[in-house]
Amino acid sequence: MGKAKFERNKPHVNIGTIGHVDHGKTTLTAAITITLAKTGGATAKNYADIDAAPEEKARGITINTAHVEYETPARHYAHVDCPGHADYVKNMITGAAQMDGAILVCSAADGPMPQTREHILLARQVGVPALVVFLNKVDMVDDEELLELVEMEVRELLSSYNFPGDDIPIIKGSALAAVEDRNPEIGQERILELMAAVDEYIPTPERPLDKPFLMPVEDVFSISGRGTVVTGRVEQGIVKVGEEIEIVGIRPTVKTTCTGVEMFRKLLDQGQAGDNIGALLRGVDREGVERGQVLCKPGSITPHTLFEAEAYILTKEEGGRHTPFFTNYRPQFYFRTTDVTGIVKLPEDKEMVLPGDNVKMDVELINPIAMDKGLRFAIREGGRTVGAGVVSEIKK
């Protein structure tokens, strides 16, 4: 059978499997494709297909990630699965594979383990909006009470990280039974129940087009007789000719009007998410705008200097630092299109950060940057990437 033609008339959702090593994330991913393939909603993939995840680069960091796609009657899904724990940390922090929701896989035989906890914390820090739980390997637990105990433990753990532990759907089953097409009452029937829960519980993300206009400034030109043109790729939303917009970040915020939009040397009446455009700005001189600022819908985003972040620091082998760093470390933080120097403050209990660590830290920038929770950045020293991070909370 050739590659299935996916109808793009359904809402699209990005999802992933998270959880402790060997609890069955990859087996579950295979089980979903094998189960949905029966009704033509997927191409069946086995464990080995998914486990041999190709390398990709995101923000200068190499990550192994497997991508599969499938559909339910309600939606089309792109699903990511990572072979190693470090790949999950890097993936979630860089946003290489943006997740609109995740399936937390937890072995019923072991209950929550250290990486179960860490992945839930990461999901909270990087802003994964919703989780659904698959309690796997139920055939290895013959005591119903023990199963209920593990479920309670998972719910308490979710609640402790501010997820709605009491409301999150928990489906109990065996991914292996589904892959091997046996014991449907714990196998494929449970996979269908899981997908129904994912359909219902994980919200459809807002499309980039529906969000407020935002365009990072890449370049600025002065065109004689016409004014100042700012070029860049529209990240989200729509800008129409004649609309008032703001220039935010680095310097005090300025209001201006977009008096023209051009793409490929043609004049348009609007630019939208995904377009590489030149925007003509009224009454702004070439010195009034610089790379690293953003054009946006007025009031939709504000400039900040102090924030909390979750960061991953590259190992020496990944081309990162060879030595640890301490509080008052001063690297560059690369946001969208520019570097800004910032000062790092580590949590009280963290004396130093070693290459390969992921860490929560406070950063104070020397210039304000337009930011929201969830904004990704790279940490650089002299143009070389030494880490990646995501804004988890804005403080000032």
Swiss-Prot record:
Residues binding Mg(2+), per UniProt: T26
Protein name: Elongation factor Tu 1
Residue segments, region G5: 174-176
Binding positions for GTP per the UniProt entry: 19-26, 81-85, 136-139
Stretches the record annotates as G1: 19-26
Species of provenance: Hyphomonas neptunium (strain ATCC 15444)
Catalytic activity: GTP + H2O = GDP + phosphate + H(+)
EC annotation from Swiss-Prot or TrEMBL: 3.6.5.3
Stated family: Belongs to the TRAFAC class translation factor GTPase superfamily. Classic translation factor GTPase family. EF-Tu/EF-1A subfamily.
